[in-house]
């Protein structure tokens, strides 16, 4: 198989169990949403190809389990990340309160060369629930938190309604590209067990 040159961008999605990390990824990559909740065990990833300006990039999005007992997996999966996405449920204050922990955990485990400039993106998910009447974390509170972390970009999303998902991941991809690690990707070198089923690629710029 011939070698294909492209830019591989590794993105890690972190947040408490049940905030919708997997649903956001599936909506972005597969345009599918399931009402059935299935906890992620360990870690999994999906990929999507997209074009940013004149660059063809492969976005590799890692979904790590929110359960504390799986946080020991961090070092292996966080290292080499180009961007970290922090997600919470706007209807669950605890999921917002733990963002500091996730932020610190990532920086500790990933150990980026310059922690102050490493790109983070914050997603406030499930804004569709109860027409927004059940939310407990205000947009202002979330933006204030982002400002305290160096003006992290913030998006309010709904995986179910596909609201703001593409816009959020385009921002994520651009942030990751700015922090890229250029790699030669040999597809035959990826273990079969690590390749997600029904991998979907798109050549369009989202």
From Swiss-Prot:
Organism of this sequence: Vigna aconitifolia
Pfam family, one: Ras
Coarse class of the protein's main subcellular location: membrane
GO cellular component annotations of the record: plasma membrane; vacuolar membrane
Protein name: Ras-related protein Rab7
Recorded topology in the membrane: Lipid-anchor
Lipidation (S-geranylgeranyl cysteine): 204, 206
Organism phylogeny: Eukaryota, Viridiplantae, Streptophyta, Embryophyta, Tracheophyta
Family: Belongs to the small GTPase superfamily. Rab family.
Modified residues (Cysteine methyl ester): 206
Domain of life: Eukaryota
Record localization: Cell membrane
Free-text function comment from the UniProt entry: Protein transport. Probably involved in vesicular traffic.
GO molecular function, one term: GTPase activity
């Amino acid at each position: 198989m011939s070698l294909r040159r492209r830019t591989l961008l590794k993105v890690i999605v972190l947040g408490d169990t049940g905030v919708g990390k997997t649903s956001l990824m599936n909506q972005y990559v597969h345009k599918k949403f399931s009402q059935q909740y299935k906890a992620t065990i360990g870690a999994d990833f999906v990929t999507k190809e997209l074009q940013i300006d004149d660059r063809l990039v492969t976005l590799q999005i890692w979904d790590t389990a929110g359960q504390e007992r799986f946080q020991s997996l961090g070092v292996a999966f966080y290292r080499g990340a180009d961007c970290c996405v922090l997600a919470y449920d706007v209807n669950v204050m605890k999921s917002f309160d733990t963002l500091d922990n996730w932020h610190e955990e990532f920086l500790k485990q990933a150990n980026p060369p310059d922690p102050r400039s490493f790109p983070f993106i914050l997603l406030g998910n499930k804004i569709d629930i109860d027409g927004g009447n059940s939310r407990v974390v205000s947009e202002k509170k979330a933006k204030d938190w982002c400002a305290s972390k160096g003006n992290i970009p913030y998006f309010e999303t709904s995986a179910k309604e596909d609201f703001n998902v593409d816009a959020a991941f385009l921002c994520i991809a651009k942030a990751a590209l700015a922090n890229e690690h250029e790699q030669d990707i040999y597809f035959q070198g990826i273990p079969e067990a690590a390749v997600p089923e029904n991998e979907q690629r798109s050549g369009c710029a989202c």
